[in-house]
């Protein structure tokens, strides 16, 4: 099975020529040598502004000519070109723009320079990290099923609703693997009776942990379970990540073939929209925030043998976990720290860019920010207590990839500095960049152009231009304190569980998640108005230097305002009235009349159709049936999934214009299993996760402006915090007898599977 790729655009003649040149024997060495010479020249050659403008124009032309190519060498060339232009900008900043008249100017100017150095450092690290994505393909398993390993599937849960967890458990029980070689465990922090009962009903195994208050949260839960299980491998699924049936068959091959691989990570795909997708006007046409990491960065990490463990949707070798004493408990991001510790011991990690599970995205901006605060705290903790640049066991590539991941969470402070810098002049008259507009055009604009344009080429449809700025700005003012406190006191902070599942019956504005940016934007607007007043009313009284400074800082303030307003727009929470998220799916089905009770099962009045979307609540089908608007009609829906037949009872609510809407008749556990299989378990369910157009920066900027416009529509009420209603527990189901294990009363020796 291979990943479905979007159609490759036809290359132009110039693109083919540039690819041929870069593919010639020895071309890579020539390009590398030329690039090194150019980088040296960038730090030594002095040019006046006019000469620099010519160089900048030539570099832009080179970008457009070479950028027509689609090869990997083309991308590397563009990254080297971008690095050259950025180093040229850095040289200019260090040598010609630090002419300060007062000590206040000096302090503010150095602060801005430090933020720029951080941004350039992250830019160069990202180029290194993604220079050669591995694009690993699945490996087949041994032909003899007897040679397949045993697997324990861990589903840890703390305070999540059973209605969410049960779908993951049923999906895991349906994974296509020899029944005597797989066990599914609910790891319950807190021993809740309804979870134990559900395990008995569905045939899963249950491990409850009573004393969880000071027991290292999720990492402690996993370590508690490791001591009570024995499978060769452990598949970890967050309690909302529902696997496809093919998960293990797709992802296990590399683990069996290479005994040095300790981890096989797969993408975290979400079937529900994140707050940015749901709340912004063009969000649904924009890739999810996490796609950049799972589509580009992790593939780059894999080349350097530096794939991170992301806490879920991953297979781990038990031997490797036991070799480091279990999951890391020193930080609140046990996943990345565990991978780092395994790699220090010589284990390899791997990444497969095929989504084989899907979960719920954070559904409210408040919870999204809270989750990112935990990630930032955890990665900074690792930076402090187990810095990848120190200690033994890691190769240089691994050190740099981990360093990039950890220091990327320092973004909050530089982001605030970039946004606020024009206020230094607009409010206090402190010009912290001593440069004429021509110099800015010659040095700064080319640096910005190449950074944005090269990122668009590298990221393609995984992340759109300017959206990283919006993501960071949304969270920056909340993360500043977390960053500083964790750097100074890495032991502070605790694990928090991300709340998921629920509805929002009315459109609301989340003031609690946006008030810092609202205050920030108000101050920025004040500064912009002052600058415009000076330019319009007092223009003739200003000297040339003052006019240039006001023009530069007003333009800067306007850019900051655009980003701030886009971040504020995310707080406009749109209605979410469905408990069950609909998923687009095109599945051939046969719809037929449900037989009366006691009657033989026959395909009476069978009609073929194609599903439009599916959910745990029902399905929409395009089907040539006469219009039905008078009431519910009992039907059955038949499909063939991955070579196996499935048949689900449903009620047709209506049929108009060839589209029929059904609700599932979900009255027993077996039916619920089939629905989970139909909606989430298909091997090809999520292969279109990257089905987004390639990035075009101007189009991306326009989409942000449309989102800002939508912020001011007259609808919705202001709220201090967003609390979605919880989904009620699912219907009671038939009972089945399993084995139950509680902390402190573990059955010694063996754990048997319940009858299914």
Swiss-Prot record:
It comes from the Bacteria. GO terms for cellular component: plasma membrane. Residues 319-379 are annotated as: Catalytic subdomain B. GO terms for biological process: cellulose biosynthetic process; UDP-alpha-D-glucose metabolic process. InterPro entries: Cell_synth_A, Glyco_trans_2-like, Glycosyltr_2/OpgH_subfam, Nucleotide-diphossugar_trans, PilZ_domain. Activated by bis-(3'-5') cyclic diguanylic acid (c-di-GMP). It holds the Pfam family Glyco_trans_2_3. Residues 576-681 form the PilZ domain. Residues 721-756 are annotated as: Disordered. Substrate binds at residues 238, 240. It is found in: Cell inner membrane. Belongs to the glycosyltransferase 2 family. This is Cellulose synthase catalytic subunit [UDP-forming]. It comes from Komagataeibacter sucrofermentans (strain ATCC 700178 / DSM 15973 / CECT 7291 / JCM 9730 / LMG 18788 / BPR 2001).
């Amino acid at each position: 099975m291979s990943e479905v790729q979007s159609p490759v655009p036809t290359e132009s003649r110039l693109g083919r020529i540039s690819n041929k040149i870069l593919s010639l024997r020895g071309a890579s060495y020539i390009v590398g040598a030329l690039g090194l010479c150019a980088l040296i020249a960038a730090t030594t050659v002095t040019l006046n502004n006019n000469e620099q403008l010519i160089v900048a124009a030539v570099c832009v032309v080179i970008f457009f000519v070479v950028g027509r190519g689609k090869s990997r060498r083309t991308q590397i060339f563009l990254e080297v070109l971008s690095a050259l232009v950025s180093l040229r900008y850095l040289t200019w900043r260090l040598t010609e723009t630090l002419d300060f008249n007062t000590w206040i100017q000096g302090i503010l100017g150095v602060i801005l320079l430090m933020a720029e150095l951080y941004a350039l450092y992250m830019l160069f690290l990202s180029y290194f990290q993604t220079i050669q994505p591995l694009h690993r393909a699945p490996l087949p398993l041994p032909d003899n099923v007897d040679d397949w390993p045993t697997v324990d599937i861990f589903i840890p849960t703390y305070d999540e609703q059973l209605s969410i967890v049960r779908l993951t458990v049923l999906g895991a029980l349906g994974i296509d693997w020899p029944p005597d070689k797989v066990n599914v465990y609910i790891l319950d922090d807190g021993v809740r009776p309804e979870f134990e009962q559900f395990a008995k009903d569905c045939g899963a195994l249950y491990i409850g942990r009573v004393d969880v208050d000071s027991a290292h949260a999720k990492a402690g839960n996993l370590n508690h379970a490791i001591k009570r299980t024995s499978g060769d491998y452990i598949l970890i699924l967050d309690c909302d990540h529902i696997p496809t049936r093919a998960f293990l068959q797709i992802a296990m091959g590399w683990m069996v073939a290479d005994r040095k691989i300790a981890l096989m990570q797969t993408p975290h795909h979400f079937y529900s929209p994140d707050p940015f997708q749901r709340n912004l006007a063009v969000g649904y046409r924009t890739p999810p925030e996490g796609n950049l990491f799972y589509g580009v960065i992790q593939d780059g990490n894999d080349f350097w043998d530096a794939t991170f463990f992301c806490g879920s949707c991953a297979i781990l070798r038990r031997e490797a976990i036991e070799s480091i004493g279990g999951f890391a408990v020193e930080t609140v991001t046990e996943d990345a720290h565990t991978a780092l510790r395994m790699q220090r011991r010589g284990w390899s990690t791997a990444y497969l860019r095929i989504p084989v599970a899907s979960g719920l995205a954070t559904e409210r901006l408040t919870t999204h920010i809270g989750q990112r605060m935990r990630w930032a705290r955890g990665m900074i903790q690792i930076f402090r207590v187990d810095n990848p640049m120190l200690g033994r066991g890691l190769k240089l590539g691994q050190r740099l990839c981990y360093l990039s991941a950890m220091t990327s969470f320092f973004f909050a402070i530089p982001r605030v500095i970039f946004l606020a810098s024009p206020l230094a002049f607009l409010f206090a008259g402190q010009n912290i960049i001593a440069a004429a507009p021509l110099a800015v055009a010659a040095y700064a604009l080319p640096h910005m152009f190449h950074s944005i344009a090269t990122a668009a080429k590298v990221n393609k449809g995984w992340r759109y231009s300017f959206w990283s700025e919006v993501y960071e700005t949304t969270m920056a003012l909340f993360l500043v304190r977390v960053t500083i406190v964790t750097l100074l006191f890495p032991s502070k902070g605790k694990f928090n569980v991300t709340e998921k599942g629920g509805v929002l019956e009315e459109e609301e504005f989340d003031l609690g998640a946006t008030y810092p940016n609202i205050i920030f934007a108000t101050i920025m607007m004040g500064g912009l108005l002052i600058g415009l007043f000076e330019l319009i009313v007092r223009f003739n009284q200003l000297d040339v230097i003052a006019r240039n400074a006001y023009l530069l800082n007003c333009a800067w303030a306007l850019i900051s305002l655009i980003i701030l307003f886009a971040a504020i727009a995310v707080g406009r929470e749109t209605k979410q009235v469905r408990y069950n998220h609909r998923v687009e799916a095109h599945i051939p089905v046969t719809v037929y009349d449900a037989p009366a009770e006691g009657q033989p099962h026959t395909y009476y009045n069978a009609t073929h159709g194609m599903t439009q979307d599916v959910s745990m609540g029902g399905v929409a089908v395009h089907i040539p049936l006469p219009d039905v608007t008078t009431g519910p009609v009992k039907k059955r829906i038949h499909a063939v999934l991955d070579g196996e037949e499935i048949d689900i009872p449903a009620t047709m609510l209506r049929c108009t214009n060839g589209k029929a809407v059904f609700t599932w008749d979900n009255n027993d556990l077996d039916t619920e299993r089939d629905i989970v299989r139909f909606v989430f378990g298909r091997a090809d369910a999520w292969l279109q996760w990257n089905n987004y157009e390639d990035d075009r920066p101007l189009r991306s900027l326009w989409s942000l402006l449309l989102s800002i416009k939508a912020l001011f529509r007259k609808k919705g009420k202001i709220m201090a915090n967003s609390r979605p209603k919880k989904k009620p527990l699912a219907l009671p189901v038939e009972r089945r007898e399993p084995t139950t294990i509680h902390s402190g009363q573990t059955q010694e020796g063996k754990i048997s599977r319940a009858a299914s």
